[in-house]
């Protein structure tokens, strides 16, 4: 009989999964930021209708909803399912596994950044949408291209100073 504890660490994950998700997310963020730069998001005096009709708003709203899906149900999030079903079976086993909590926190950070941009855009703040999209793109690109997860580093830093108290503690790094 196995005993489970609420203080146990969650099962580790293949670190290539979040990197794959970051790659797709970076591409979507780049497209959304491009559309935001060419739409109503950079102009002053736009109407609410013009701001809501901005294609960049819709692309970044979809990305934001994907962030929510990613941190509320990572097992069913589309990029994770795609990675596990189509990509991971074709790869060698990972050299190391990682704690899933930092990548999940990174999804929350991405959601927060893009949500602030969306809300400010709807409120009529020029440049809020492309700036938020670009900031989220930089973070996703760093993860996808260089395996540097900015949100994960933020999580680890906050855990080390005690702002976040992960159940089961942190794995040794």
Say what each PLM segment does.
Residues 1-173:
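Membrane-interfacial helix-loop segments of redox and metal-homeostasis proteins
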């Amino acid at each position: 009989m196995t005993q489970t504890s609420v203080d146990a660490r969650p099962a580790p994950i293949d670190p290539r999964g979040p990197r794959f998700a970051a790659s797709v997310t970076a591409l979507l963020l780049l497209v959304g930021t491009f559309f935001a730069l060419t739409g109503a998001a950079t102009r002053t005096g736009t109407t609410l209708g013009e701001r809501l009709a901005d294609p960049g708003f819709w692309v970044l709203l979809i990305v934001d909803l994907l962030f929510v899906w990613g941190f509320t149900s990572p097992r069913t999030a589309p990029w994770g399912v795609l990675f596990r079903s189509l990509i991971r079976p074709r790869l060698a086993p990972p050299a190391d596994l990682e704690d899933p909590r930092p990548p999940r926190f990174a999804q929350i950070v991405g959601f927060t950044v893009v949500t602030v941009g969306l809300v400010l855009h709807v409120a009529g703040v020029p440049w809020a949408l492309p700036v938020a999209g670009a900031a989220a793109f930089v973070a996703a690109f760093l993860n996808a291209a260089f395996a540097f997860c900015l949100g994960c580093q933020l999580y680890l830093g906050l855990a080390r100073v005690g702002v976040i108290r992960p159940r089961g503690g942190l794995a040794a790094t």
